[in-house]
Amino acid sequence: MLKNYFFDVIIIGGGHAGTEAAVASAKIGCNTLLLTHNIKTIGEMSCNPAIGGIGKGHLAKEVDAMGGIMAKAIDAAGIQFRILNASKGPAVRATRAQADRYLYRKAVYNMLKNTNNLLVLQQFVENLIIKNNNVIGVISKAKDKFYANSVILTVGTFLDGKIHIGLNSYPGGRTGDLSSISLSSNLRKLPFRVKRLKTGTPPRIHASTVNFNILTKQESDNPLPVFSFTGSVSEHPRQIPCYITYTNKNTHDIIYNNLHYSPIYTKNIEGIGPRYCPSIEDKIIHFAHRDSHQIFLEPEGLMSNIIYPNGISTSLPVDIQLKIVQSIEGLEKASIIQPGYAIEYDFFDPRDLKNTLESKIINGLFFAGQINGTTGYEEAAAQGLIAGINAAKKVLEQDSWYPNRSQAYIGVLIDDLCLQGIEEPYRMFTSRAEYRLSLREDNADLRLTEIARKLGLVNENHWHKFCIKLDYIERERQRLRNLWVQPNTIGIQDLNQLLKKPIMCKINGEELLRRPEINYKTLTNLSFFQPTLKNIQAAEQIEIQIKYEGYIAQQQEQILRQLNYEQTLLPKNMDFSLVTGLSNEAISQLNNHQPYSIGQALRISGITPIAISLLLLWLKKNNLLANKINK
C-alpha cells in the first residue's frame, strides 16, 4: 500500500510521452507518480515496431541529448539499424531502427524502475480534481484520490477510443485495451476545444506463412548505427533483416471493389487520418495512377512469429483483409494473426496550450503526445520531455523552459502545435524546420546537452562523455589547423591523387577538408595527417563543421536576426483591433491565435510584413518595445 497519496507531479499514461515526462520530472527532483491502466504495456509500440526516420530520428536524438530514454531503449531493442538519406546532406540524414517489441518495453520499464523519485502504479484514471481553476489531483476508477500540484495527460488514443473493422465498431484504446470513456466525458465538461482524429494499423501476419525466399531482403547498415549519444554497438541485440514486397493490380481491384465496407468511405469514421501514413484504401484512391505500393515486412522481434506489413494499414472487414494480403507476392499463403483496424479518439486543440505545454485554461494541467493531435512515438516522446520539465519546474517555482525553432526540432514541433494548431495528425519532417542545416541529428547533443545539464536532466556519466567529445573536436580541429603541406612536401602525390587539382600552395588540414573530394577518413589516412580519431561521433562532427562552416555561419546570422523578433513580446490577451491600419483578416488571425511575440505573429497565415511593421510601431508608441523574453 502507498504511505500517502500526495505527489509533486502525476502523469496519466505510460506510453512514449508519459515515460519521458515521468523520467524528466523525477530527474529534476520532483516526487513523481506515473499512473497506467496496465504496467505490462508501459512503453508499448501500438503501431509499427520502429523508432526514427526522417524528422523523427532528429526528435529521438534531441530527446536523448536531454537525458531522455527513447534512444537508449531502441539501442537495447533494435534488430535492424539503418541511416536514411545517407547519400544526401547531413541535414536530412536520419537514423531508423526496427524494434523487438518485447525488448523495447523491457528496456523502458527497467529505466523507469531504476529512476529515483518515481513511482509507477497501475490505476485507471477517471477524472481530475480541480479547485479554483487549478488541477490538484486525479481520481481513479477505484475512487482513490491522488494529489499533486502538476498533472500531465499523456493518454494517447485512449480518450473515447473507438476501434473500427469493416462496418463494426467497439470501444477500445488499442486492440486488447479498454477505452477511457469516463475520463473523456469528464474532460469534455471543461472548456476545452475537443475534436476527433483517427489512425490505423495493418493486419499482423504469421511469419511461418510468408515465402521470404522470393522477396527482396533488406539488411542492417554496416557499420551499425547507434541511436544514443552515450550508447554503443555492443548494446544492440542480434540483427535480422526486413523484406520488401509490393501491392499489385489484383490487390487494388480487391480494395476498390470493397470500399463500401470501409468505415472511412461509408463515413462511419468522422476523425481525420494521418496524411503521411494513409490507409491502403486511401492510397489506391488518391494515387490511382500507381500500379503498386511498396510494403516493408518487418519482424516484430527476435523470438516473435509476427510480421508487421508496413504499408497496408486498413480497416476493411477481416475476410477482405485476408484477400488483400494473399494477393501480394510472397504472401499468397499468409495467415493473419491480428486484423488491421482504424481507431478514432479525442484530441484537444493544442492552441489552448502555452509553449510549456501547460493548459491556458486549467493551471497546472499539462498535455503531451497524441492528445495534442500528433502522430508518432518520437513526437510524443519530445512533448513528454517538455511537459515533464515544465510540470516539475512549476512545482519547484523555477523558470520554465522550452526550445525555440532555431534550437531544436522539438521547438519547431511545439511552436507549430501551439501557434497554428492542427487539422490532421501532425508528423515531423525536416522540411518543417527553416534552420534544418543547424538542426541536424549529429549535433543534437551540442545544441541541447549543456542546457539539459543545467536543468538537472543529465547525469555525471552522460556529462563526462559529452565533455570528452567536445574536447576531441576542439583538439582535432586545432591539430588539423596546425598541420601544413606544400607542393614540394615528400609524398604529396598521395594527396594530389585524391584531388581534382593538385595543390599549388601551402595548405593546412582544415582547408583541405573543405574540398568536396576529401573526407575526414581519407585525409587522416594520409601520412602527414595521421592518426584518425577513434571517436566516430567526434570525427563526423569535425567533418561536417568544417565542410559546411560557411553555410552554417550564414544560417546563424539569419537566426540572430529572427531571434530579435522572437524575443519581442506582445501583451497577453491583446485586442489587436487597437492597432491602427491592420486589415480585418490580420486582426481576426491575430486575435484568434494570440501570438506571444512578434516572431510568432510572423508565422501566422495572412500576416504580412506590413502588419508586422504596424505591430512594431504600436509597441513603440505604447512604450512596450523594450519587453523581451529572458530565456
Curated annotation (Swiss-Prot):
Cofactor(s) of this protein: FAD
PROSITE patterns per record: GIDA_2
GO MF annotation terms: flavin adenine dinucleotide binding
Primary site of residence: cytoplasm
Task performed by this protein: NAD-binding protein involved in the addition of a carboxymethylaminomethyl (cmnm) group at the wobble position (U34) of certain tRNAs, forming tRNA-cmnm(5)s(2)U34.
Annotated FAD binding sites: G13, G14, G15, H16, A17, G18, V125, S180, Q370
Residues at which NAD(+) binds: 273-287
Nuclease listed as a keyword: no
HAMAP family named among the record's database cross-references: MnmG_GidA
Record's GO cellular component terms: cytosol
Superkingdom classification of source: Bacteria
GO BP annotations, alphabetical order: tRNA methylation; tRNA wobble uridine modification
Cellular localisation: Cytoplasm
One Pfam family named in its UniProt record: SAM_GIDA_C
Family, similarity comment: Belongs to the MnmG family.
Protein name: tRNA uridine 5-carboxymethylaminomethyl modification enzyme MnmG
Subunit structure: Homodimer. Heterotetramer of two MnmE and two MnmG subunits.
Record's keyword terms, sorted: Cytoplasm, FAD, Flavoprotein, NAD, tRNA processing
